[in-house]
Amino acid sequence: MAAKEVKFSTDARTRMLRGVDILADAVKVTLGPKGRNVVIEKSFGAPRITKDGVTVAKEIELADKFENMGAQMVREVASKTADLAGDGTTTATVLAQAIVREGVKAVAAGLNPMDLKRGVDLAVAAVVADVKSRSRKVATNAEIAQVGTISANGEKEIGDMIAKAMEKVGNEGVITVEEAKGLDTELDVVEGMQFDRGYTSPYFVTNAEKMTVELDNPYILLHEKKLSGLQPLLPVLEQVVQSGRPLVIIAEDIEGEALATLVVNKLRGGLKVAAVKAPGFGDRRKAMLEDIAILTGGQVISEDLGIKLESVNLEMLGTSKRITITKEDTTIVDGSGDKGAIDARCKQIRAQVEETTSDYDREKLQERLAKLAGGVAVIKVGGGSEIEVKERKDRVDDALHATRAAVEEGIVPGGGVALLHAVKALEGLASGNADQEVGISIVRRALQAPVRQIAENAGHDGAVVAGKIGESKDLSFGFDAQTGIYTDMIKAGIIDPTKVVRTALQDAASVAGLLITTEAMIAERPKKDAGGMPGGDMGGMGGMGGMGGMDF
């Protein structure tokens, strides 16, 4: 076991605070509409430019082990806030730094760290309750766009695009962000359920120009096994021919005689038909077939359920308004499934999302949920260079998370104003003793930190701005750093999601409380470099002893 180095009390806290300051100072320059960028060197490829707090925090690793521990604890604040709310990472870092700084001073002055932490926790609970009570639901599409715009660093185009995407696919729908090939940022919306399997044979194509299969009002046969023999298929094919409607077969695989017969019938014009492989693999395939069955009002033909293909009638088949099949994917638009059954299925998938511990499974379940609930939107982010595209993609991701958070828990005035005005909730807050009272005061001061930092990044005096906002009785009154004027934040469209503000404060206080109560730190002792080795130490290398001190 390697030797360890141990630091105690003031020495430990001072080193730790230095690490906190280095990380927080690098992150906080990005806060607000006039926040600056940070350039990060990459071991390969071009440097990365970002204005995203958590991206900066994740890149910082300090040489001093004790300083690094402090920095890593605050990095944890940014990561946790990013995971829970998707935005507000810089605010969380600024709050954590403010609480730790004041807390370390108080401990150095001889106050009890545990009581300080209890005071901090009391104050945070009161502030969170106050912020929640002032939160209001997002009512209009314009407000969704405003949240997106603020989070995307004032880029209105991004805010509008996210609002449009959410309007199209609903709040449950999946919105993904990709890098575009060109200069422009575009929005692609796929309405209905789409899965990544195309036609099994190009002979099924109905639109030769686009090489797609387009079928209106088709029957949909869902089969979980392979189809290779013709005999079991004949009864259902005859019924479909008599109905005069098209047929789409979705099965594990369609091959041999079955596929040949379908192709011949299609070419002779006796039957409009197309065959597609079922999406997914293993248990996920079964679940997705079940989803399609519920969406289209059909049944999965499965021998586990005792249903044989020979005994299938038209009532067991699903239907939809339209199906479009390309070489790569299939889109089912407007399935005729029962709305109650679809809602119940969505509820079931949501419960699985809550329970699962695997990120991969969660992502797949959310995709299934979106396909059932509304559709998929893809925002393709363009730019003049690869570096610019990556930087914009970071901002679009942030904006998307912030917008989802706003829809979930509502909005409060932005620009750090909600936290600054929440100071009033701490007046008359009962504490157990004088040390806890100091803990409450620490939070009272820390709540000003985001407003001060936003103002300072815009070239104004943070203390003056915070003082002026604090004097106002109007809880929406704040400072628009973009224009440099005091205004009603809600009317100016400067709004933050309640969830982001709440999560930032809770995560910051949680980690800061642990840092304040630290009394000893243990780190591995750095290994001493064995400089240029003298000749004598190279025993066993015969006559090469004299080469020990050479630089190669």
UniProtKB/Swiss-Prot annotation:
Domain of life where this protein originates: Bacteria
Q: Name one GO cellular component term.
A: cytoplasm
* Single annotated GO MF: ATP-dependent protein folding chaperone
Binding residues annotated for ATP, in chain numbering? 30-33, 51, 87-91, 415, 496
Tell me where it resides: Cytoplasm
| Reaction equation(s) it catalyzes | ATP + H2O + a folded polypeptide = ADP + phosphate + an unfolded polypeptide
What are the GO BP annotations of this UniProt entry?
protein refolding
Which Pfam families does the protein's record reference? Cpn60_TCP1 (PF00118)
Where is it predominantly found? Answer: cytoplasm
Cysteines joined through disulfide linkages = none
CDD domains this protein is in? Answer: GroEL
The UniProt record lists the keyword Cytoplasm: yes
Keyword Isomerase assigned to the entry: answer is yes
Q: Which controlled-vocabulary keywords does the entry list?
A: ATP-binding, Chaperone, Cytoplasm, Isomerase, Nucleotide-binding
- Please state the Enzyme Commission number of this protein: 5.6.1.7
Membership in a protein family: Belongs to the chaperonin (HSP60) family.
NCBIfam families membership:
GroEL (TIGR02348), PRK00013.1 (NF000592), PRK12849.1 (NF009487), PRK12850.1 (NF009488), PRK12851.1 (NF009489)
Under the subunit heading, UniProt states: Forms a cylinder of 14 subunits composed of two heptameric rings stacked back-to-back. Interacts with the co-chaperonin GroES.
HAMAP family associated with the record: CH60 (MF_00600)
UniProt-listed PANTHER family: 60 KDA HEAT SHOCK PROTEIN, MITOCHONDRIAL
Q: What does this protein do?
A: Together with its co-chaperonin GroES, plays an essential role in assisting protein folding. The GroEL-GroES system forms a nano-cage that allows encapsulation of the non-native substrate proteins and provides a physical environment optimized to promote and accelerate protein folding.
**Per its record, how is this protein called by name?**
Chaperonin GroEL
Native source organism of the sequence: Paramagnetospirillum magneticum (strain ATCC 700264 / AMB-1) (Magnetospirillum magneticum)
